Protein backbone atom coordinates (compact mmCIF):
# COMPACT_ATOMS: atom_id res chain seq x y z
CA UNK A 1 0.00 0.00 0.00
CA UNK A 2 1.24 3.47 -0.88
CA UNK A 3 -0.53 6.23 0.99
CA UNK A 4 -1.13 9.74 -0.25
CA UNK A 5 -2.38 12.41 2.15
CA UNK A 6 -3.77 15.72 0.93
CA UNK A 7 -5.29 18.52 2.96
CA UNK A 8 -7.83 21.27 2.34
CA UNK A 9 -8.49 24.09 4.82
CA UNK A 10 -11.50 26.38 4.99
CA UNK A 11 -11.03 30.14 5.08
CA UNK A 12 -13.16 30.88 8.14
CA UNK A 13 -11.57 28.67 10.80
CA UNK A 14 -8.59 27.18 8.97
CA UNK A 15 -10.01 23.73 9.73
CA UNK A 16 -8.22 20.92 7.94
CA UNK A 17 -10.11 18.24 6.04
CA UNK A 18 -7.96 15.35 4.81
CA UNK A 19 -8.17 12.97 1.88
CA UNK A 20 -6.23 9.80 2.69
CA UNK A 21 -5.82 7.55 -0.33
CA UNK A 22 -4.26 4.20 -1.14
CA UNK A 23 -2.72 5.08 -4.49
CA UNK A 24 -2.63 1.45 -5.56
CA UNK A 25 -6.36 0.78 -5.14
CA UNK A 26 -7.76 4.36 -5.09
CA UNK A 27 -9.62 3.51 -1.86
CA UNK A 28 -9.84 6.65 0.26
CA UNK A 29 -11.37 8.20 3.34
CA UNK A 30 -12.11 11.79 4.28
CA UNK A 31 -11.08 12.78 7.79
CA UNK A 32 -13.20 15.64 9.18
CA UNK A 33 -15.50 17.91 7.20
CA UNK A 34 -14.81 21.63 7.31
CA UNK A 35 -16.91 24.59 6.21
CA UNK A 36 -15.84 24.26 2.56
CA UNK A 37 -16.54 20.59 1.75
CA UNK A 38 -16.46 21.31 -1.97
CA UNK A 39 -12.68 21.55 -1.73
CA UNK A 40 -12.15 17.95 -0.64
CA UNK A 41 -14.91 16.75 -3.00
CA UNK A 42 -13.12 18.35 -5.95
CA UNK A 43 -9.80 16.95 -4.75
CA UNK A 44 -11.20 13.42 -4.57
CA UNK A 45 -12.74 13.72 -8.02
CA UNK A 46 -9.55 15.09 -9.50
CA UNK A 47 -7.60 12.21 -7.97
CA UNK A 48 -10.14 9.60 -9.08
CA UNK A 49 -10.35 8.45 -5.46
CA UNK A 50 -13.11 6.11 -4.28
CA UNK A 51 -14.14 7.51 -0.90
CA UNK A 52 -15.18 4.60 1.34
CA UNK A 53 -15.89 6.43 4.62
CA UNK A 54 -15.89 9.74 6.46
CA UNK A 55 -14.06 9.59 9.79
CA UNK A 56 -14.51 12.27 12.45
CA UNK A 57 -11.85 13.09 15.02
CA UNK A 58 -14.49 14.99 17.05
CA UNK A 59 -17.68 16.96 16.47
CA UNK A 60 -16.94 20.64 16.87
CA UNK A 61 -19.02 22.50 14.29
CA UNK A 62 -16.05 23.34 12.09
CA UNK A 63 -15.21 19.63 11.76
CA UNK A 64 -18.69 18.38 10.79
CA UNK A 65 -20.32 21.31 8.99
CA UNK A 66 -20.06 19.76 5.53
CA UNK A 67 -21.23 16.22 6.28
CA UNK A 68 -24.42 16.41 4.23
CA UNK A 69 -22.54 17.81 1.25
CA UNK A 70 -19.99 15.01 1.48
CA UNK A 71 -22.74 12.40 1.65
CA UNK A 72 -24.37 13.91 -1.44
CA UNK A 73 -21.06 13.82 -3.30
CA UNK A 74 -19.80 10.38 -2.26
CA UNK A 75 -23.04 8.47 -1.73
CA UNK A 76 -24.18 6.97 1.55
CA UNK A 77 -20.71 6.08 2.78
CA UNK A 78 -20.28 5.31 6.49
CA UNK A 79 -19.73 8.19 8.89
CA UNK A 80 -17.78 7.13 11.98
CA UNK A 81 -17.35 8.97 15.29
CA UNK A 82 -16.66 8.03 18.91
CA UNK A 83 -19.71 6.88 20.87
CA UNK A 84 -19.42 9.82 23.28
CA UNK A 85 -20.23 12.26 20.47
CA UNK A 86 -22.58 10.17 18.38
CA UNK A 87 -25.63 12.22 19.42
CA UNK A 88 -24.11 15.37 17.95
CA UNK A 89 -24.22 13.85 14.47
CA UNK A 90 -27.40 11.79 14.82
CA UNK A 91 -29.58 14.37 16.55
CA UNK A 92 -27.88 17.65 15.75
CA UNK A 93 -27.16 18.29 19.44
CA UNK A 94 -24.43 20.92 19.72
CA UNK A 95 -21.27 19.86 21.48
CA UNK A 96 -20.60 23.51 22.31
CA UNK A 97 -23.60 25.55 23.46
CA UNK A 98 -22.30 28.69 21.79
CA UNK A 99 -22.84 27.14 18.35
CA UNK A 100 -26.58 26.47 18.67
CA UNK A 101 -28.35 23.71 16.67
CA UNK A 102 -26.33 21.82 14.10
CA UNK A 103 -28.10 20.66 10.95
CA UNK A 104 -26.53 17.23 10.69
CA UNK A 105 -29.10 14.67 11.91
CA UNK A 106 -27.64 11.65 10.16
CA UNK A 107 -29.25 8.55 11.63
CA UNK A 108 -26.89 5.77 10.57
CA UNK A 109 -23.66 6.72 12.28
CA UNK A 110 -20.95 4.13 12.96
CA UNK A 111 -19.05 4.34 16.24
CA UNK A 112 -15.32 4.20 16.88
CA UNK A 113 -13.75 2.68 20.00
CA UNK A 114 -10.32 2.74 21.61
CA UNK A 115 -8.01 0.13 20.11
CA UNK A 116 -10.32 -0.68 17.22
CA UNK A 117 -8.97 -1.19 13.72
CA UNK A 118 -11.35 0.63 11.38
CA UNK A 119 -11.24 -0.75 7.84
CA UNK A 120 -12.31 1.18 4.76
CA UNK A 121 -11.45 -0.72 1.62
CA UNK A 122 -7.71 -1.39 1.82
CA UNK A 123 -7.15 1.30 4.46
CA UNK A 124 -6.82 0.33 8.12
CA UNK A 125 -6.84 2.94 10.90
CA UNK A 126 -6.04 2.30 14.54
CA UNK A 127 -8.37 4.28 16.80
CA UNK A 128 -6.78 6.07 19.76
CA UNK A 129 -9.25 7.69 22.16
CA UNK A 130 -7.69 11.06 23.01
CA UNK A 131 -10.38 12.97 24.93
CA UNK A 132 -9.95 16.25 26.74
CA UNK A 133 -10.66 18.84 24.09
CA UNK A 134 -13.94 16.98 23.70
CA UNK A 135 -15.28 13.80 25.37
CA UNK A 136 -15.11 11.66 22.25
CA UNK A 137 -11.99 13.00 20.61
CA UNK A 138 -10.01 10.36 18.74
CA UNK A 139 -6.74 10.21 16.89
CA UNK A 140 -6.49 7.96 13.85
CA UNK A 141 -3.21 6.19 13.08
CA UNK A 142 -2.33 4.59 9.77
CA UNK A 143 1.20 3.47 8.89
CA UNK A 144 3.53 6.37 9.78
CA UNK A 145 0.79 8.97 10.08
CA UNK A 146 -1.57 10.03 12.85
CA UNK A 147 -4.52 12.39 12.50
CA UNK A 148 -5.02 14.09 15.85
CA UNK A 149 -7.96 16.45 15.34
CA UNK A 150 -7.86 19.19 17.97
CA UNK A 151 -5.84 17.17 20.51
CA UNK A 152 -2.28 17.88 19.34
CA UNK A 153 -1.01 20.67 17.09
CA UNK A 154 2.40 21.82 15.92
CA UNK A 155 3.70 23.60 19.00
CA UNK A 156 0.43 23.48 20.90
CA UNK A 157 -2.44 21.34 22.18
CA UNK A 158 -6.21 21.65 22.00
CA UNK A 159 -8.30 24.02 24.07
CA UNK A 160 -9.67 22.63 27.30
CA UNK A 161 -11.59 25.63 28.61
CA UNK A 162 -15.00 24.42 27.46
CA UNK A 163 -17.61 23.06 29.87
CA UNK A 164 -17.17 19.49 28.57
CA UNK A 165 -13.38 19.65 28.24
CA UNK A 166 -10.78 18.17 30.57
CA UNK A 167 -7.25 19.53 30.38
CA UNK A 168 -5.73 16.77 32.51
CA UNK A 169 -7.29 14.05 30.35
CA UNK A 170 -6.08 15.81 27.22
CA UNK A 171 -2.45 15.93 28.33
CA UNK A 172 -2.60 12.37 29.70
CA UNK A 173 -3.98 11.05 26.41
CA UNK A 174 -1.33 12.85 24.39
CA UNK A 175 1.46 11.59 26.64
CA UNK A 176 0.29 7.99 26.93
CA UNK A 177 -0.96 7.39 23.40
CA UNK A 178 0.49 9.92 20.97
CA UNK A 179 3.96 10.41 22.44
CA UNK A 180 4.22 6.62 22.61
CA UNK A 181 4.39 6.59 18.81
CA UNK A 182 7.66 6.62 16.87
CA UNK A 183 9.45 9.97 16.62
CA UNK A 184 9.14 10.01 12.83
CA UNK A 185 5.35 9.60 12.90
CA UNK A 186 3.86 12.48 10.92
CA UNK A 187 1.13 14.36 12.79
CA UNK A 188 -1.75 15.84 10.81
CA UNK A 189 -3.80 18.12 13.04
CA UNK A 190 -7.23 19.70 12.86
CA UNK A 191 -5.67 23.11 12.26
CA UNK A 192 -2.28 24.30 11.11
CA UNK A 193 0.71 22.56 9.56
CA UNK A 194 1.94 19.00 9.88
CA UNK A 195 4.56 18.13 12.45
CA UNK A 196 6.15 14.98 13.88
CA UNK A 197 5.83 13.19 17.19
CA UNK A 198 9.56 13.64 17.79
CA UNK A 199 9.39 17.38 17.26
CA UNK A 200 6.44 17.76 19.62
CA UNK A 201 8.07 15.56 22.23
CA UNK A 202 11.14 17.81 22.24
CA UNK A 203 9.73 21.30 21.66
CA UNK A 204 6.02 21.51 22.49
CA UNK A 205 5.85 23.85 25.51
CA UNK A 206 2.58 22.29 26.73
CA UNK A 207 4.19 18.85 27.02
CA UNK A 208 7.50 19.74 28.63
Feature-to-residue mapping (PLM):
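A generic structural signal for alpha->beta connector loops
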Residues: 2, 76-77, 108, 124, ...
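Conserved beta-strand hairpin/beta-sheet module of binuclear metal-dependent hydrolase folds
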Residues: 2-47, 139-149
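Short Gly/Pro-enriched turn/cap motifs at secondary-structure boundaries
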Residues: 8-10, 74, 107-109, 129-131
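Residue-level detector of beta-strand structural context in well-folded domains
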Residues: 18, 110, 115-116, 138, ...
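Conserved S/T- and glycine-rich ATP-binding loop of Class I adenylate-forming
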Residues: 20, 57, 130
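Metallo-beta-lactamase
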Residues: 26, 49, 93-98, 102, ...
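Hydrophobic residues in well-ordered beta-strands that form the structural core
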Residues: 31, 79-83, 148-149, 189
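Active-site HxH/HxHxD metal-binding segment of metal-dependent hydrolases
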Residues: 35-119, 202-206
Amino acid sequence: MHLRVEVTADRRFGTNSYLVEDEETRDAVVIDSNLEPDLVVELARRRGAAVRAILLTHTDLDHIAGLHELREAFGKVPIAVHEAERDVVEQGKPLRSEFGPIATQIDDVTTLAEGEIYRAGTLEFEVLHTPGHSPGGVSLKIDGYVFTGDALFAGSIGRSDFANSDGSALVEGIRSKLLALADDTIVYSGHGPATTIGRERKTNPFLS
